[in-house]
């Protein structure tokens, strides 16, 4: 099998991204940080690092980025923090914490640019829902957010735990409803009620990981449109770069076309602007973009 080649340039998204656009979901890697036991290996092909991502930012029109701790590094945040330092003021981190994370640890992580913690309740994840209470306690005290990922078809089972989250939090990857979700079903009703509580956002990212169909992912589009129409102030967007589940060059997404598709599920241009700028500023407590 030939080495994976990632597409990093092309025709820009139409309409163009607004000034201050935030990519809220991606991973980045530097040499010297091997994969750890319990998680997947490092991404295929050449290690996707800061220089590659800067090309993607220029192509798409991204100004700010949230670098999310990858599963390959499990509970060692060293790679993610090094990437944030390399990217400078444009970048912040979502990292792994648990019940052993001290207040001093939290202070150091915050000083290094961390704005959130990750829960990944799927195979290969470092910290799952069983540790949510401890993660939420620390995140809330630090004014961080929590990124939560699990099989969305278990939403009703997890509801009592999710209703207790005090931090701002985001339901990752279009909810990952692997068995699908009816727009008039109980899971959708429960999700909209959770959003209405005021501290939950919904992330448009990695649609191909959640869909049971091929492009244009009509199944995910149907319920994503409902959520976006219900609460346009609660939608955030991410590239999910470098698309770690993709193994072949021929299957590698065109990030501009993928962004056009998923952002097109928002009800209007004002909602698109909010999803790219104001909503992530609220979720991650980012400083607002200064007017020119």
UniProtKB/Swiss-Prot annotation:
Keywords: Isomerase. One of its GO terms (molecular function) is isomerase activity. Does not require a metal cofactor. Pfam families: Amidohydro_2. Its EC number is 5.4.1.4. It is an enzyme of class 5 (isomerase). Pathway: Carbohydrate acid metabolism; D-galacturonate degradation via prokaryotic oxidative pathway. It catalyses: D-galactaro-1,5-lactone = D-galactaro-1,4-lactone. Gene3D superfamilies: Metal-dependent hydrolases. The keyword Isomerase applies. Belongs to the metallo-dependent hydrolases superfamily. Catalyzes the isomerization of D-galactaro-1,5-lactone to D-galactaro-1,4-lactone. This is a step in the oxidative degradation pathway of D-galacturonate, which allows A.tumefaciens to utilize D-galacturonate as a sole carbon source. This is D-galactarolactone isomerase. It comes from Agrobacterium fabrum (strain C58 / ATCC 33970) (Agrobacterium tumefaciens (strain C58)).
């Amino acid at each position: 099998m030939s080495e994976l080649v990632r597409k990093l340039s092309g025709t820009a998204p139409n309409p163009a991204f607004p000034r201050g656009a935030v990519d809220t979901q991606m991973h980045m890697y530097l040499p010297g940080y091997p994969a750890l036991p319990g998680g997947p290996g490092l991404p295929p092909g050449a290690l996707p690092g800061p220089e590659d991502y800067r090309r993607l930012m220029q192509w798409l029109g991204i100004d700010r980025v949230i670098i999310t701790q990858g599963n390959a590094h499990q509970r060692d945040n060293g790679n993610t923090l090094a990437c944030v330092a390399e990217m400078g003021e444009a970048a912040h981190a979502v990292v792994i914490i648990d019940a052993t994370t001290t207040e001093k640890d939290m202070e150091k992580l915050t000083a290094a640019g961390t704005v959130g913690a990750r829960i990944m309740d799927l195979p290969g994840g470092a910290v799952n829902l069983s540790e949510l209470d401890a993660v939420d306690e620390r995140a809330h005290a630090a004014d961080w957010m929590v990124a939560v990922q699990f099989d969305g078809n278990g939403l009703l089972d997890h509801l009592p735990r999710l209703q207790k989250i005090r931090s701002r939090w985001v339901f990752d990857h279009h909810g990952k409803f692997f068995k699908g979700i009816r727009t008039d079903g109980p899971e959708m009703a429960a999700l909209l009620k959770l959003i209405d509580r005021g501290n939950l956002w919904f992330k448009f990212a990695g649609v191909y990981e959640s869909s049971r169909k091929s492009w244009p992912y009509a199944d995910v589009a149907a319920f994503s449109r409902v959520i976006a129409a219900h609460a346009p102030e609660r939608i955030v967007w991410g590239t999910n770069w470098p698309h770690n589940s993709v193994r072949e060059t021929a299957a590698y997404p065109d990030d501009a076309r993928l962004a056009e598709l998923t952002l097109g599920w928002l009800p209007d241009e004002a909602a698109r602007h909010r999803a790219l700028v104001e909503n992530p500023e609220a979720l991650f407590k980012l400083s607002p973009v200064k007017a020119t």
